[in-house]
Swiss-Prot record:
Keywords: Apoplast, Developmental protein, Hormone, Hydroxylation, Secreted, Signal. Residues 1-24 form the signal peptide. Belongs to the C-terminally encoded plant signaling peptide (CEP) family. This is Precursor of CEP3.
Length: 82
């Protein structure tokens, strides 16, 4: 009798989960404003001035990055002091 109750409970539980995912959420309608509607409400701003190119970061030396033995990695944020 107890095993039947467990199966009934599991069936009802799975049924309620599936019903919740089937219903989902309601989507609301929204209107898309067109460029004509935006221009009618105010003036159009000019585009922003071009930006200056960024400098490339400095290059690193050969000794900056080196391989470590497996199991002996210092980890992120820790330097190796020999």
């Amino acid at each position: 009798m107890a095993t039947i109750n467990v199966y009934v409970f599991a069936f009802i539980f799975l049924l309620t989960i599936s019903v919740g995912s089937i219903e989902g959420r309601k989507l609301t309608k929204f209107t898309v404003t067109t460029s004509e509607e935006i221009r009618a409400g105010g003036s159009v701003l000019s585009s922003s001035p071009p930006t200056e190119p960024l400098e490339s970061p400095p290059s690193h030396g050969v000794d900056t990055f080196r391989p470590t033995e497996p199991g002996h990695s210092p980890g992120i944020g820790h330097s190796v002091h020999n």
